[in-house]
Amino acid sequence: MPRSIKKGPFVDDHLLKKVKEMNKSNKKQVIKTWSRRSTILPDMIGHTIAVHDGRKHVPVFITEDMVGHKLGEFAPTRTFRGHGDHTERSTSLK
């Protein structure tokens, strides 16, 4: 269920503060954050935000298409290494 329009999109205050400071000074540095729950706003376009995935920070370059989505959508937390192969023992049991 989407968030109420009267409340507006959720963004952590510390992240929004960093983005606004970067926009004022026209700097483009990587912003490290653990806030996967924050919504991407138009102010963030062009910035690179390193989103934590549980082990490391994944750099995410923000584009126009990402506005309205959450930061966590672009930093997957699980790595799929494939299903197990058939061993000699498992095939001989059949």
Curated annotation (Swiss-Prot):
One of its GO terms (cellular component) is small ribosomal subunit. It comes from the Bacteria. Keywords: Ribonucleoprotein, Ribosomal protein, RNA-binding, rRNA-binding. GO terms for biological process: ribosomal small subunit assembly; translation. SUPFAM superfamilies: Ribosomal protein S19 (SSF54570). GO terms for molecular function: rRNA binding; structural constituent of ribosome. Signal peptide: none annotated. Belongs to the universal ribosomal protein uS19 family. Protein S19 forms a complex with S13 that binds strongly to the 16S ribosomal RNA. This is Small ribosomal subunit protein uS19.
